[in-house]
Amino acid sequence: MVRSIALCISIFLSSITAHAQLEELEKRAGLGNASGLTDSKVASGLKEALRVGAENSVKLTGKTDGYFKNEAIKILMPGNLRPLEKGLRAMGFGPKIDAFILSMNRSAEAAAPAAKKIFTDAILEMSFADARKILSGGDTAATDYFKSKTSERLTTAFRPFVEKTMSENGVMKQYKGLTEQYQSIPFAKSESFDVNKYVVEKALDGLFHELAEQEREIRKNPAARTTSLLKEVFGQSRK
């Protein structure tokens, strides 16, 4: 009899501990007054946050000047040419450099809308275990989830858009001209470089940067919670 009572007490205390741990996770995630919310509603709220953040980040990056006029994600000269940029500009190649940089950013802007479906698929695939990890993570935990689930697919999807736009804009010809000038400089090292790969990588970096900004806003700024579910799940801050 005593053993049965002890077992019941142990189970009861374990359930209290588990509940307290869940509440602490919700508090860390910036969720609102989550008491009374079911696990499925919390997961739905996180999925909704992902959807809103993903849609906003794709809109911001996939428009004209989405990359080019955003200094945080603007694609600059490749690393192998950047040290020589000042010298090349002094030699009169400024317009070519500017056209090259603009074309790289235009290619990224053309590719960005392809992320929407891939992000949507990743949201649909999210399990409650994934939601728990996001819940217990930091301000960009959802973005980190997207990175782990979509980076490979995004790279595959972005490459054709980048190659097509770069070809149409004559980027490879511009790049070849710049590298020839670079290689004509005494002691300059000639290195093989995949400019398409560079643009795809920088395009993804920019996309995830914007997604992280959107996630922070949803977690911390009530005005960014644009749906009733987001308002309910990410409601009043817990004290």
Residue ranges and their predicted role:
Residues 27-33, 203-239:
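A cross-kingdom marker for long, charged
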Residues 23-101:
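N-terminal Sec/ER secretory leader and immediately downstream segment
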Residues 93-165:
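Mid-length scaffold segments of soluble, non-membrane domains
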Residues 57, 127, 222:
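Residue-level signature of catalytic and energy-coupling elements of molecular machines
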Residues 1-4:
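Positively charged n-region of N-terminal signal peptides that target proteins for export
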Residues 6-15:
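Bacterial N-terminal signal peptides
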Residues 16-20:
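Sec/Tat signal peptide C-region and signal peptidase I cleavage site
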Residues 161-207:
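An amphipathic alpha-helical core segment
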